[in-house]
């Protein structure tokens, strides 16, 4: 259905372009998108009627609300002079990178018609961010020169203001310009270390447009923003996943450990489980002690008897000799 509607709008646009001259713009389109969820900003989209031009004060209020949450590491303000809402229909296929970044964002809103904005708006918003979001550095880049941007790897917050050249009026040249600027945007955003970026894309320098463009019911990337509106305020880039904690079974050792470091023989459970074995060990031990006792005693007695006999054998000749001497003494006295 969206595809058919696009073709019908292109046919209607072609008929107007062939028959009408261009006139100065009285309003400009605008897009906000942020990688992280920006709470409270979606109500500006819900309250917006694309048939009516959004007042400048309401736009600035929405921009400050969008930036004041301070949920980004880099704030990118893109000024595309001469941008008109018809470009998003006629050159939709050239906005490849822009659409991809909007699609992956958590918050995205768009306004097809906004009152003409001050040319110094981005500098005012940069001061607002510096004051409320603790940002020190502001980088100003020419949108047609990649050499202006020096890649950085630190974690300091920054404001980047991209000033594209004014779009040409020729259709083919305008198409080529959008393709080139889209690639430039991809080059810059891809080199920013953190994906947490808040981006505002609009025109601060109005150009020309069709006299009856306001009556053409053009929407900015309806395939993307219709989904964003239906989803509502949902964080789509939450790095910390909200998942239940993993549950693990209690640790159980493969083999049950003993109740203490040392096994005691007085453990009642040990005695009960090994009663027969303990009785056998005790009987053998007692028998061994008795055998050792009686065998040792018999050996001692035998040794004493042997020693006594040896002593008797050794002393008998001496006693005999002494007796003979005693007997000789009386006989000598008689003579």
UniProtKB/Swiss-Prot annotation:
Q: Which residues form the signal peptide?
A: 1-17
Q: Looking at the keywords, is Endoplasmic reticulum present? A: yes
* Keyword Nuclease listed: no
**A biological process from GO:** cell wall organization
Q: Give the stretches traversing the membrane.
A: 276-296
The UniProt keywords, alphabetically, are: Cell wall biogenesis/degradation, Endoplasmic reticulum, Glycoprotein, Membrane, Signal, Transmembrane, Transmembrane helix
Gene Ontology cellular component terms for the protein in this record = endoplasmic reticulum; endoplasmic reticulum membrane
Parts of the chain on the Lumenal side = 20-275
Topology within the bilayer? Single-pass type I membrane protein
Q: Which residues are glycosylated?
A: 24, 144
- Intracellular or extracellular location(s): Endoplasmic reticulum membrane
Q: Which domain of life is it from?
A: Eukaryota
- Report the sequence similarity comment from the record: Belongs to the BIG1 family.
Its function, per the record, reads: Required for normal beta-1,6-glucan synthesis.
Q: What is this protein called?
A: Protein BIG1
Its lineage reads: Eukaryota, Fungi, Dikarya, Ascomycota, Saccharomycotina
């Amino acid at each position: 259905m969206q595809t058919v509607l696009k073709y019908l709008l292109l046919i209607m646009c072609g008929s107007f372009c062939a028959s009408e001259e261009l006139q100065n713009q009285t309003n400009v389109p605008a897009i906000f998108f942020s990688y992280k969820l920006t709470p409270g900003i979606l109500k500006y989209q819900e309250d917006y009627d694309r048939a009516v031009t959004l007042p400048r004060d309401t736009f600035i209020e929405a921009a400050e609300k969008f930036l004041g949450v301070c949920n980004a590491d880099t704030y990118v303000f893109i000024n595309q002079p001469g941008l008109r809402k018809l470009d998003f229909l006629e050159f939709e296929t050239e906005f490849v990178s822009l659409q991809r970044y909007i699609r992956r964002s958590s918050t995205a809103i768009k306004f097809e018609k906004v009152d003409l904005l001050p040319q110094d708006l981005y500098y005012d918003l940069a001061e607002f961010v510096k004051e409320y979001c603790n940002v020190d550095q502001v980088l100003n880049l020419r949108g047609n020169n990649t050499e202006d941007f020096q890649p950085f790897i630190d974690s300091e917050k920054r404001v980047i203001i991209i000033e594209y050249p004014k779009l040409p009026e020729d259709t083919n040249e305008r198409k080529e310009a959008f393709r080139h600027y889209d690639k430039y945007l991809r080059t810059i955003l891809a080199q920013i270390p953190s994906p947490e970026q808040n981006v505002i894309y609009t025109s601060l320098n109005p150009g020309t447009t069709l006299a009856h463009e306001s009556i053409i019911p053009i929407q900015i990337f309806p395939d993307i923003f219709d989904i964003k509106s239906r989803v509502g305020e949902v964080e789509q880039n939450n790095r910390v996943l909200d998942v239940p904690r993993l549950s693990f079974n209690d640790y159980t050792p493969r083999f049950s450990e003993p109740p203490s470091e040392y096994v005691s023989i007085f453990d009642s459970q040990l005695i009960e489980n090994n009663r027969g074995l303990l009785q056998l060990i005790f009987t053998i031990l007692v028998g061994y002690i008795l055998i050792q006792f009686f065998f040792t005693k018999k050996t001692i007695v035998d040794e004493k008897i042997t020693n006594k006999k040896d002593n008797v054998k050794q002393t008998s000749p001496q006693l005999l000799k002494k007796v003979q001497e005693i007997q000789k003494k009386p006989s000598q006295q008689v003579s």
